[in-house]
Amino acid sequence: SLFNPGMEQPPLDLPFESGIVWSYTSGPHAAWGAVEVRAALDFAPPADAPGCLPNSTWITAAASGLVVRSDNGTVVVDMDGDGNEETGWNIVYLHVGTTHRIKLGTWVEKGDRIGHPSCEGGISTGTHLHIVRKYNGEWIPADGPLAFKLSGWTAKAASVPYQGWLISGDKIVKSNRYSSTPAHISRGD
């Protein structure tokens, strides 16, 4: 079995700075390329217009760890710090722009700035962040026994990919690719 009984996801924060309103643009969907595991969530920064435009809003580390990949729009943070993406928990950040992207080998603390959202590193119709968890090299479904939890918000999948919710107590944020108000979310810390 991939997981030990009673195992829980380590605490993770929403991947942006406190007080900045982002949009939850895609609920659980494919982690990487054609991979069928619905492990990824998408967040878009505040923007004046849609599309692939430069954005100065910061993506922050959801967890502390070692940057084991930083290229082609991708940053991977290895939470156990052993330098191996195939062991323990790893957080994958996709569409991280080249400008100000954190350097390979850097140790980050939760909340540290790691770069800016972009359209780099894969197919994208608009500037956003695609975030995914891996455990022992396997993509972890965003909705399931180890649901994706960020700053107390838990991901819930709809019946079709890209749709879903983030739920925290009685608060619900519904994914929306057009960044409408019901999709707005911010860190309250």
Task: Give the predicted meaning of each segment.
Residues 33, 44-49, 100, 112, ...:
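Catalytic cores of extracellular degradative/oxidative enzymes
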Residues 24, 130-131:
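Hydrophobic alpha-helical packing residues
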Residues 117-129:
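Active-site loop architecture of trypsin-fold serine endopeptidases
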